[in-house]
């Protein structure tokens, strides 16, 4: 397909012929609208500062790509800069990650050395009790950094980070190792599925290093041990641990400010949930899919797993309260309509300001189990976490690598999955939003996979939205859109050996909602599946990918009719400018 066949794209890399200064200057008008408490989408068309010239891609006429150094700027990028918060195909993900994607993580000056609590780096003595004592002490003190010196620490239990502002820091992923000897099945118990069957939920949940609020973790484990298979998110095991703070007036996707009925329970800096409930006609789900004849014709009622994921719960921090006008730290992910009973609500106590850094978690090497029967030799999981992070961490010989479970605004940076092979190297589920996974690597497996296992890759599901995977090297796996209609997610600047398969139960509904974007993807084995998505994903953008063909797992679109998807710079990933969509959007 020629580059002129316009079916969508996005991106911008200030290191690739475009300067961050130019991007920032061009976004002054947008920023001014936010600072004034107005709707930034209204300010976006004026996104040009005096003396700074045009934003990249805004000068050329329709249907032409502007030259930028040796590369080309797609029409889609020019369009996006004119309406960054409301573009129909490209989501705004410029504030994804911890503290809006900040380059530096918070520093906690109080330091606790695990050796002072009895931990020994001899590879033989169980250090988990001492490490957990040190973490708990930091939590009781209001926060701190728990340090692990170089060496190997055997752990026979889960390492739990359950208090805010606590960081577990090793001496580097090549110097400090946690050697895990037992699975989550052994440590906590059998974990069945709330949807029935004989599946093990350890196949997609839980970690041997587990960051979750202490009370939420305790309630979750109690439910598992009682075999009352729980929901895992922000409103408790039965999704009833919340109360209304205020109703919200109608507003449009991309608005930073909403009007509320009663601001008395709101304050700047507080974390709240925006709760949107579906109506009997499933117009909320249709909206997530982009609306129009295709989603309207889709049969939603029998997608019982998908319908169990609503209400949609979006955690967001309040930036300012001015009378009944409430400004949020991120723009609205969806429209707010009366038929969806929009509310700001409470939630379980979050984990915030906590992280894990500079270590390797290595599980004892065991044979991989059949698909969906994992024992739970899992890596690092963030759950009910907001503004948390993982940096310079490797997991080895795990069933499932790094997990985001009802986690939002978190960053995984410089992470690596290695060893005998895994089921989900990365998973993002149960309504996880606004997360950033960057500088990540999935190594080739060291043990051949058995025929009854399945490799996914970078997973996203369960109405998870506005997440980003950036600057990745995937030596195996795929872009695992795992049904459950995730939407508005971005994969950018990734090299991929596309040899994995997606999963997802048919009752979980569509593979994709609206506004998925794949931008600058280098496919080394030429396989199209789940990378070229202009024939699958509604209102999507596929920009700057290698030429690919369909083989192995081949999908058909879930929605009928025109998908309103777009394809640009097909076959030219090296030419697309900007090269990295997330980095480019951070300039806006």
Each model region followed by its residue ranges:
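Extracellular beta-strand/beta-solenoid scaffold signature
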Residues: 184-226, 337-346, 370-381, 397-399, ...
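Extracellular "leader-to-stem" segments immediately downstream of a signal peptide or signal-anchor
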Residues: 2-149, 154-369, 543-588
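Ordered hydrophobic segments in well-structured contexts
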Residues: 271-275, 315, 379-381, 389, ...
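Catalytic domains of carbohydrate-active enzymes that cleave complex glycans
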Residues: 472, 492-588
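Aromatic-lined, polymer-binding surfaces characteristic
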Residues: 405
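Conserved short loop/turn motifs at secondary-structure junctions
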Residues: 148-157, 376-379, 398-400
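Short, glycine/charged-enriched secondary-structure capping and boundary segments
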Residues: 160-163, 371-372, 484, 533
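Right-handed parallel beta-helix
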Residues: 165, 174, 352-363, 386-397, ...
């Amino acid at each position: 397909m020629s580059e002129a066949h316009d079916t969508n794209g996005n991106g911008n890399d200030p290191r690739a012929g475009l300067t961050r200064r130019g991007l920032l200057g061009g976004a002054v008008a947008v920023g001014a609208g936010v600072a004034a408490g107005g709707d930034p989408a209204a300010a976006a068309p004026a996104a040009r500062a005096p003396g700074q010239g045009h934003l990249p891609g805004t000068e050329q006429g329709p249907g032409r790509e502007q030259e930028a150094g040796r590369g080309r700027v797609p029409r889609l990028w020019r369009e996006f800069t004119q309406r960054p918060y409301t573009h129909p195909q490209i989501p705004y993900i410029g504030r994804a990650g911890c503290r809006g994607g900040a380059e530096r993580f918070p520093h906690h000056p109080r330091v606790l050395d695990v050796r002072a609590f009895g931990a020994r780096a001899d590879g033989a003595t169980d250090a988990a009790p001492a490490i957990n004592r040190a973490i708990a002490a930091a939590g009781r003190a209001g926060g701190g950094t728990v340090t692990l010196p170089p060496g190997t620490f055997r752990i026979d239990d889960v390492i739990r980070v359950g208090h805010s502002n606590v960081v577990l820091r090793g001496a580097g992923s090549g110097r400090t190792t946690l050697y895990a000897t037992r699975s989550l099945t052994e440590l906590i118990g059998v974990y069945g599925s709330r949807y029935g069957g004989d599946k093990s939920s350890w196949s997609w949940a839980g970690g041997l290093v587990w960051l979750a609020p202490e009370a939420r973790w305790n309630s979750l484990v109690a439910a598992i041990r009682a075999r009352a298979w729980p929901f895992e998110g922000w409103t408790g095991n039965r999704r009833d641990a919340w109360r209304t703070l205020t109703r919200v007036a109608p507003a449009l996707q991309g608005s930073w400010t909403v009007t509320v009925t009663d601001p008395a329970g709101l304050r700047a800096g507080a974390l709240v949930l925006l709760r949107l409930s579906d109506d009997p006609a499933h117009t909320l789900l249709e909206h997530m899919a982009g609306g129009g004849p295709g989603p309207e014709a889709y049969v939603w009622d029998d997608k019982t797993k998908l319908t169990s994921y609503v209400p949609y719960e979006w955690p967001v921090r309040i930036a300012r309260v001015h009378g009944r006008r409430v400004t949020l730290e991120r723009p609205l992910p969806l429209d707010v309509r009366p038929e969806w009973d929009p509310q700001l609500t409470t939630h379980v106590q979050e984990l915030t300001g906590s992280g894990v850094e500079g270590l390797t978690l290595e599980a004892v090497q065991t044979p991989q189990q059949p698909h969906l029967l994992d024992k739970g030799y899992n890596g690092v999981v963030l759950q009910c976490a907001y503004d948390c992070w993982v940096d310079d961490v490797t997991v080895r010989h795990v069933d499932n690598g790094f997990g985001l479970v009802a986690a939002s605004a978190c960053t995984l940076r410089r992470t690596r999955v290695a060893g005998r092979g895994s089921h989900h190297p990365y998973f993002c589920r149960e309504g996880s939003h606004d997360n950033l996974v960057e500088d990540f690597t999935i190594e080739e497996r060291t043990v051949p996979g058995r025929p009854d296992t399945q490799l996914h890759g970078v997973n996203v599901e369960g109405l998870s939205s506005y997440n980003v995977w950036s600057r990745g090297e995937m030596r195996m796996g795929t872009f695992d859109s795992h049904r459950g209609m995730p939407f508005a997610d971005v994969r950018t600047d990734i090299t991929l050996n596309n040899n994995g398969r997606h999963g997802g139960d048919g009752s979980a509904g569509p593979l994709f909602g609206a506004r998925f974007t794949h931008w600058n993807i280098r496919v080394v084995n030429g396989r199209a599946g789940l990378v070229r998505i202009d024939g699958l994903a509604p209102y999507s953008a596929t920009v700057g990918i290698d030429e690919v063909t369909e083989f192995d797992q081949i999908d058909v679109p879930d929605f009928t009719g025109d998908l309103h998807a777009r394809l640009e710079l097909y076959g030219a990933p090296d030419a697309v400018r900007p090269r990295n969509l997330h980095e480019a959007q951070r300039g806006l």
